[in-house]
Design a protein with these regions (language model features):
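Divalent metal-coordination and catalytic microenvironments
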Residues: 6, 21, 26, 49, ...
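Metal-associated gating/positioning segment near the N- to mid-region
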Residues: 50-116
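Active-site gating loops and adjacent loop-to-helix segments of metal-dependent hydrolytic enzymes
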Residues: 67-94, 135, 140, 150, ...
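N-terminal metal-binding scaffold of metallo-dependent hydrolase/deaminase domains
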Residues: 1-39, 50, 375
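Divalent metal-dependent hydrolysis catalytic cores, especially in the metallo-beta-lactamase
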Residues: 83-89, 97-132, 141-154, 214-215, ...
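C-terminal cap of metal-dependent C-N hydrolases
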Residues: 4-10, 334, 346-379
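Metal-coordinating catalytic core of metallo-dependent amide/deamination hydrolases
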Residues: 39, 128-230, 234, 272, ...
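His/Asp/Glu-enriched, well-ordered alpha-helical/loop segment
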Residues: 68-69, 73-81, 85-87, 214, ...
Length: 379
């Protein structure tokens, strides 16, 4: 397949440029001017006058585990069994037939990080998925992508044994310390050949200790952001700061630490105290300070299929336009560790391609075609 004559988003070129895209076997083979039709086989898509981007990526979502329109019976986001549950994995709660999936794809969203809810201090393991497939295993790109933890209002109000920020920080530290102890005991048992009983939760924590995956930290208030950074630095952990609602008030502090930020949701009522400071201006301020940002819908808090709208509103509020496009494509791919496959239109990447009628941030634009790994999802 060749997609011809479109305005293709190429970050190394500084924006949209006229190019053709050659796709074979679900992969982008070449992005160049004047690709010969003979290279395409029978399928040629004329995108003259259209804008073409990578498939959009939401770096923090509850799609497929908090199902749209189904109520509490299909909400597998928060388990409410304990404050610390590293043994839970979102892959075991994913329903590929969530109604939101089809709507999201038709709005240009092709991948997402599916996370446990935020009412436990340690909620479980996040999985990165492509929004295509009939079983979870077909969807999963990274089964164990991050350890979800939460600070502030949500775990405080959940009613577990500890009800203060101090107590919740202690529980997270204790979980990490338990994992360190588990790692040492496992290594000693391997040396002397003694019996060692595997613990599912602690096994899930080991990639975090080894810096293979990050701590995916739900934080809104500025002091909670600082606590998450404090704990990450204490243990030398990778960290992704999620929500960061009050980030604009501590931008100088954030800029001194090399942690990416996933901003949002923003386009919703101030439903709790911690959301009082939410504003679209935060994205531009953090970006100008050199902080890598992603933009999230936090589905189903706000709909994932309006992800491009949230990015556009951030641009309207001061975020650079190209940085706004990166915040829903390239940046989340890098933060989620899937940038070898997703996030940019270049040779070797998956053919996750969205064709828009106008610029993606134009109020009147429409998604005309979506290809996910080369498959036309809009048929």
């Amino acid at each position: 397949m060749i997609i011809k004559n479109g305005q293709v988003l190429l970050f190394e070129e500084g924006g949209f440029v006229k190019r053709d895209i050659l796709v074979k076997d679900g992969k982008i083979i070449k992005v160049a001017e004047g690709i010969s039709p003979e290279e395409a086989g029978e399928e040629i898509v004329d995108a003259k006058g259209k804008f073409i981007t990578p498939g959009l990526i939401d770096a923090h979502s509850h799609i497929c585990i908090s199902e749209e329109g189904m109520g509490a019976i299909a909400d597998d986001c928060n388990d409410y069994s304990d404050a610390v549950m590293p043994y839970l994995e979102t892959i075991d709660g994913i329903n590929p037939f969530d109604l939101a999936v089809d709507t999201a794809v038709k709005a240009g969203v092709t991948s997402a990080c599916v996370c446990p809810g935020s009412d436990s201090v340690v909620g479980g393991i996040c999985s990165v998925v492509k929004l295509k497939g009939k079983v979870a295993e077909e969807m999963v790109l990274e089964r164990k992508a991050a350890v979800k933890c939460s600070f502030g209002e949500n775990p405080k109000r959940a009613g577990y044994s500890f009800k203060t920020r101090m107590g919740n920080a202690y529980l997270l530290r204790k979980c990490i310390e338990d994992a360190i102890d588990y790692k040492h005991r496992k290594e000693e048992a391997a040396k002397d050949g003694s019996y060692f009983r595997t613990d599912i939760g602690m096994e899930n924590m080991l990639p975090l200790l080894e810096k293979k995956i990050p701590l995916h930290a739900h934080v809104h208030r500025a002091d909670d952001v600082c606590t998450a950074i404090r704990i990450a630095k204490e243990y030398g952990l990778k960290l992704v700061i999620v929500h960061c609602t009050d980030g604009i008030s501590i931008v100088d502090f954030l800029s001194k630490h090399d942690y990416p930020v996933i901003l949002g949701p923003t386009m919703y009522p101030r439903s709790k105290l911690e959301s009082m400071g939410r504003c679209f201006e935060t994205a531009g301020v953090l970006n100008k300070a050199g902080i890598k940002i992603c933009i999230t819908a936090d589905h189903d808090v706000t709909p994932i299929y309006y992800l491009s709208v949230y990015a556009a509103q951030s641009v309207r509020a001061g975020l650079d336009e190209i940085e706004g496009l990166k915040a829903v494509t390239k940046n989340p791919a890098e933060v989620l560790g899937i940038d070898d496959r997703k996030g940019e239109l270049m040779a070797g990447r998956d053919a996750d391609i969205v064709i828009w009628s106008k610029h993606p941030f134009d109020y009147d634009t429409k998604v005309e075609k979506v290809f996910l790994e080369g498959q036309d999802m809009t048929i």
